[in-house]
Regions:
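Ala/Thr-enriched low-complexity intrinsically disordered regions
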Residues: 2, 8, 16, 21-23, ...
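Residue-level detector of alpha-helical transmembrane segments in integral membrane proteins
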Residues: 2-3, 11-12, 90, 146
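Intrinsically disordered, low-complexity polyampholyte segments enriched for Lys and acidic residues
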Residues: 4-5, 219
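Short polybasic linear motifs
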Residues: 12-13, 215
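Nucleotide and nucleotide-moiety/phosphate-recognizing core
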Residues: 20-174, 182-197, 204-205, 211-217
Length: 219
């Protein structure tokens, strides 16, 4: 499983569950980080105009998938109030997004698994439909979102069958998401028409900016 392909996406105006997909999808909201750039707070539970960011992500993701898991490593009971199964990392030490993906693949009920970060409340309402299109080709392992020349590796859709491969990578000490992707057949899906949807909120200042409706840096 080697190489990376550049892909163009199928655009859909629908906001219901990924039309035309051949298999159901599990969604995983990644909320397992330490929020260091926001002062060590749990970012997914920070309020954006009165609602936790993770709740806003959930409202965008849930119509597109068949199951939602939340990967979190603290405040588990508060995350459970959002109505989803909450699954902490199996690896200790806050090992990063790959640890969250690993747990998601371990717990997913469906063969296709999409991940999104908890701090991106504006994610596209057709994210899953567009990422799923390249995986109609069985040789493709994983699809990742891209805007311009910038890939967004945490916005990915992959196959559950990759779990043993990811487990071996993590057991060998691998932690960098790009390094794992380099060993797979990855297609990058262009979202140039929705670049602002991938804006994430990393700092208290960016949270205040989002609350006032101003454009975030990089939009």
């Amino acid at each position: 499983m080697t190489g990376k392909k550049q892909g163009t996406s199928r655009h859909s105006s629908l906001v219901t569950r990924h039309p035309g997909a051949t298999a159901p999808v599990t969604g995983v909201i990644l909320a397992g980080g330490l929020g260091r750039r926001m002062g060590g707070v749990d970012k997914g539970l920070q309020l954006l105009n009165g609602r936790p960011m993770a709740a806003r992500v959930l409202s965008r993701l849930a119509p597109q998938v068949d199951e939602v898991l939340i990967n979190a490593n603290q405040n588990l009971e508060r995350y459970k109030l959002l109505g989803c199964r909450v699954v902490p990392d199996q690896l200790g030490g806050y090992a990063g997004p790959l640890a969250g993906l690993h747990r998601g693949l371990s717990e997913a009920r469906h063969e296709l698994v999409v991940t999104v970060p908890c701090d991106s409340p504006f994610l596209p309402e057709d994210l899953v439909a567009r990422l799923a299109a390249p995986l109609h080709d069985e040789s493709v392992d994983l699809a990742v979102a891209r805007t311009g020349i910038q890939a967004h590796p945490v916005f990915c859709l992959c196959r559950r069958r990759l779990l043993p491969h990811l487990t071996a990578f993590l057991q060998d000490g691998g932690r960098k998401i790009d390094a794992w992707y380099a060993s797979l057949n990855v297609v990058e899906v262009a979202f140039d028409d929705e670049a602002a949807a991938f804006s994430n909120i990393n700092t208290a200042e960016e949270l205040r900016t989002a609350e006032t409706g101003q454009r975030l840096p990089g939009e």
